[in-house]
Structure formats: C-alpha cells, structure tokens
Amino acid sequence: MTSLKMCTSVAAVVAIAMSNAMVASAHSFPESETPSAGQQVASAPAEVTINFDAPIEKLFAKLEVTGADGKNEAAGAPQISDDGRRMSVKVASLKPGDYTVKWAVVGIDTHHTEGSYTFSIASGGS
C-alpha cells in the first residue's frame, strides 16, 4: 500500500509540474484590435488599441501606426493596462488613407512576438 501511495504522489507532482509548464509557455498574441485588421473606419480614431490573450511586459512593448508616407503617427509611448493585456497609443489627427499598425511585445513568459495589420480611414473621415 505504501508503494501505491508513493506512485500516486509522484504522479500528482508530475501532473502539477506539467500543467504549470504549459501555462508558463503561453505566448502573447492579439485577441482583438481597434480599429480591427482590414477595417475601413468612417472617422479617424483617437487611439489604436490591441488586446492580448496573455499579459505583456510594459518595458518591451512597441506600437507604431504609420501612413503611406512611413511616418509614425503614434503620439508617445504605448500605454499598458494594469492587467498587462491591453496596449494602446494615442494617434495624431489621421487623414483619410491606409495605415499599418506594427506591434512587438515580450510576454511574461519572456517570449517575443510581433506582427502587423492594416486599417483605413474613408475619404472625408479625418
């Protein structure tokens, strides 16, 4: 009976260790964006926001919003929510046209992820 209890205890410890490893290895990827990828908005947004599926490190967060001229329209550094899952940046008065949002983050698991997407502002929407 003692060996059965020992095997059960070892199995429980291994299961807990494996579940913790799976949680720790989760990378941070966008769940949603505002404006969203591919969206054409009627008026210029005051800010661009990305919601992540896992917390990100504030120190390593980057968010750029560029127009056709390549100029970064972000007004300052990105702001990170208290729970670390939301990154936003204010933008200057954007004119109608196409914009590319480029982001790069480091999750609390220390893994770097990055990506980009586009949105557009309809004519007359500045």
Predicted regions and their residues:
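Short strand-edge motifs at loop-to-beta-strand transitions and within beta-strands
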Residues: 85-89
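Bacterial N-terminal signal peptides that target proteins for export
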Residues: 1-11
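N-terminal signal peptide c-region/cleavage motif recognized by signal peptidases
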Residues: 19-23
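A glycine-anchored, Pro-Gly-centered beta-turn/N-cap motif
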Residues: 95-101, 115
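Extracytoplasmic/periplasmic copper-protein system
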Residues: 25-31, 39, 112-126
